[in-house]
Regions:
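Glycine-rich, proline-tolerant flexible connector loops at the mouths of alpha/beta enzymes
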Residues: 21, 25-34, 52-74, 220-231
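A short alpha/beta connector and helix-capping loop motif
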Residues: 34-38, 42, 101-102, 106-117, ...
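N-terminal amphipathic alpha-helix/helix-capping segment at the start of soluble metabolic enzymes
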Residues: 1-21, 79, 251-254
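Catalytic alpha/beta core domains of metabolic enzymes, predominantly
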Residues: 131-219
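Structural preference for beta-strand elements that scaffold enzyme active sites
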Residues: 18-22, 51-55, 89-93, 110-111, ...
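Catalytic beta/alpha-barrel core
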Residues: 71-73, 87-101, 110-124, 137-149, ...
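Active-site beta-loop-alpha junctions enriched in small/polar residues
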Residues: 25-28, 57-61, 97-99, 117, ...
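Alpha-helix-loop-beta-strand connector modules within alpha/beta enzyme cores
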Residues: 41-48, 67-93, 128-138, 188-196, ...
């Protein structure tokens, strides 16, 4: 399986590498809360000697209600993420929703995420692949809930043809099981790894960690007051204990 690197940050993900931790907020709220969360997670993961990429979305474009909080938007959101990156010296992960956002997002984010619902959108995939490769970043592609793990081969092929390079991390986040329900088929992780890409698992939605190369986790200092997906967020105060356990599990199964 391919081991991918972010040379600027001396980070690697793949077989034999430390547990790769993409962690942060579901959505950006304000700069103070963002800095509080990023600082705490950096301190925890530095102590545990685990690679850390700070994640936060600038726009939650698929909220169920038009009245729901979506985020600060691309211009203000990317400025906030750039400030976190500069002040804390940490790599950034964020997602995008439209092809025309690719260049701007790739200029700030080291790990550019394509949301699960959008992975079949060829124009978005191609534009994101080209912009991210040009910026020397990595792609983080969430497997759609309606896709079989082996169908990710087609997504990887599009990216390869668009950018002529292998720089994609796949993410397992569950599969549709009837209406309004998700299940996690643990075989999916190995199935996707057999496609040649490292695999993370969105553990705050899937709540499992069997053999993945990394984790994608969303935290909040006070989940009950989070402006988006509070019930799916983990309390920031528990981050160190959780990552310490995950590090031990990774060491035991490696």
């Amino acid at each position: 399986m391919t081991v991918l690197q972010l040379p600027k940050w001396s980070l690697s993900i793949g077989d034999g590498q430390p547990l790769f931790c993409i962690a942060g907020l579901n959505v950006l709220e304000d700069i103070d809360l963002t800095m509080q969360t990023a600082t705490h997670l950096k301190d925890v993961l530095t102590r545990l000697e685990l690679p850390f990429v700070f994640k936060a979305s600038f726009d939650k474009a698929n909220r169920s209600s038009i009245k729901s909080y979506r985020g600060p938007g691309i211009e203000k959101g990317l400025a906030m993420l750039a400030e976190v990156k500069q002040r804390l010296n940490v790599p950034i992960c964020t997602d995008l929703h439209e092809a025309q956002q690719a260049e701007a997002v790739a200029a700030v984010a080291d790990l550019v995420q394509i949301p699960a619902f959008l992975v079949r959108q060829t124009d978005l995939v191609v534009a994101t692949a080209r912009a991210t490769h040009k910026a020397c970043g990595l792609l983080h592609v969430k497997k759609a809930q309606f896709l079989a793990p082996w169908d990710c081969r087609n997504i990887l092929s599009k990216i390869k043809e668009a950018a002529d390079a292998d720089f994609t991390i796949l993410c397992e986040r569950g599969s549709s099981f009837g209406y309004n329900n998700l299940v996690v088929d643990m075989l999916s992780i190995d199935e996707m790894k057999m496609l040649g890409a490292p695999v993370t698992i969105d553990a705050t939605h899937a709540v499992q960690l069997p053999g993945a190369d990394g984790v994608f986790l969303e935290f909040h200092p006070d989940p009950d007051k989070a402006l988006c997906d509070g019930p799916s967020c983990l309390p920031l105060s528990g981050a160190e204990d959780l990552f310490r356990s995950l590090k031990a599990i990774r060491a035991a199964v490696a």
